[in-house]
Amino acid sequence: MSKDDKVKDRELKDFGIIYLSGVIEDEASETVCKEIIEYNISGKVDHIQMIINSSGGSCPAGFAMIDIMEWSQLPIYTTGIGMIASMGLLVFMTGTKGRRVITPRTSLLSHRYSDISLGNHSQLLAGRKEQDLEHTRIVNHYLRYSEIDSKEKLEEYLLRDVDTWLTPEEAIQFGIADVIEPLNPQINGERR
């Protein structure tokens, strides 16, 4: 990381901002978890603003972030920009209800849990159990953080056998986002 990047990161931290971009993996999860913990300890901010632009990634890494977000005593406001997909969408949904904002151009993707497994028969059977557990965690997360009230409806609309791309309006309808808002309210989708 360059000296300029470190200065910019420090400036974001002064305002309680976490920027999560790219694939969610262990390193990104560790960074985000540490930042949330530091904000809770420091007492310097009254809320955390998490800006997310992520195509998804690892379930264990994402659920580690979600666990720390739920642990946080500070409210965490989430803003989705660019793309919030797969595990990125689950992290976004965990934000404080009423403060989960997406921009009009945000792409949203929901899909069933997917994985690739290699190994002998016994290893594949053991791996299948973990896959079932991950699927159950994902279903329970949607039921907790969306307006969908049953596994059947969830699998009909959002966790189908094919990728489900959502408009920002559909995200509001399903209760996985609360507000559609341009980052600059003066623009309102019009040309300057």
Model-inferred region functions:
Residues 1-192:
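Terminal-region recognition feature
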